[in-house]
């Protein structure tokens, strides 16, 4: 029996592309056996696994414009541009404004792996679904802690940074785990080559406190580019389906505009049309 995995690589506000993909999948009744989430992609997948259609869209297009969610004020006050405790605690807990349906999340047999980077030694950490607990989404926060923009997030006594600096496109991980086909959701153009330049300045800052993680950040461009090339190789073999936006609509990791968010969501929704044929081939 064919086993299918899905990967959402995250990408800050660009990651709303994946929300569109997953909402279309929920409408079409498409399930997968395993979800691999990186950074914001991990958060997207919690709603997908809980089958909460439209929940992610509300976070990106409504809550994200609140200063409590992500702002320079939050950075200067809490040393975190994105207030992870507000997003994945205040809003998401059972008594929050838009709680995750934890019972549905837990009951769904779909597996879930969350990628993070150990801030102390730079090692890749793959958290299991079982570490997502009632009103405890710490591994999502850890996977989303963008270096320098956020402090490392501590889980079980260990500090972690964003999974995107450790294993940004975990296609090889999914295949090694035994999945035959992989749906890969990107939030950059599929042929975009990452450049090292933009990571050098934050890596120099990070090096003062977390040198191993800084080296991971410094080399992220190569890790991402190499993993994406590998994904394209597997795509040519029919084992991977790459879904990616054709335009970023003015969005980046920490920059947003309402029109761009809506366009990215719609493009993700439309891109999901390719999934049934891929799974049936």
Task: Please annotate each region the language model reported.
Residues 1-38, 46-281:
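Patatin-like phospholipase
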């Amino acid at each position: 029996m064919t086993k299918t995995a899905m990967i959402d690589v995250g990408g800050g506000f660009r990651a709303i592309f994946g929300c569109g993909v997953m909402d279309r999948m929920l409408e079409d009744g498409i399930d997968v056996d395993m979800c691999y989430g990186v950074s914001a992609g991990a958060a997207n997948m919690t709603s997908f696994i809980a089958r909460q259609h439209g929940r992610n869209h509300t976070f990106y297009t409504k809550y994200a414009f609140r200063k409590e969610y992500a702002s320079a004020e939050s950075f200067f006050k809490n040393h975190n541009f994105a207030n992870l405790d507000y997003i994945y605690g205040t809003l998401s807990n059972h008594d929050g404004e838009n709680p995750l349906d934890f019972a549905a999340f837990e009951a769904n047999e779909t597996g879930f792996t969350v990628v993070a980077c150990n801030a102390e030694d730079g090692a890749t950490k793959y958290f299991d679904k079982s570490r997502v607990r009632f009103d405890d989404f710490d591994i999502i926060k850890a996977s989303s802690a963008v270096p320098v923009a956020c402090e490392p997030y501590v889980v079980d006594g260990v500090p972690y940074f964003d999974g995107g600096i450790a294993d940004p496109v975990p296609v090889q991980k999914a295949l090694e785990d035994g999945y035959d086909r992989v749906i890969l959701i990107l939030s950059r153009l599929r042929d975009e080559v990452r450049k090292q330049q933009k990571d050098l300045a934050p890596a120099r800052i990070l090096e003062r406190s977390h040198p191993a993680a800084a080296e991971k950040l410094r080399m992220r461009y190569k890790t991402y580019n190499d993993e994406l090339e590998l994904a394209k190789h597997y795509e040519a073999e029919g084992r991977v389906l790459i879904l990616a936006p054709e335009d970023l609509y003015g969005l980046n990791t920490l920059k947003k505009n309402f029109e761009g968010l809506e366009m990215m969501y719609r493009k993700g929704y439309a891109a999901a049309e390719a999934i049934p044929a891929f799974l049936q081939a």
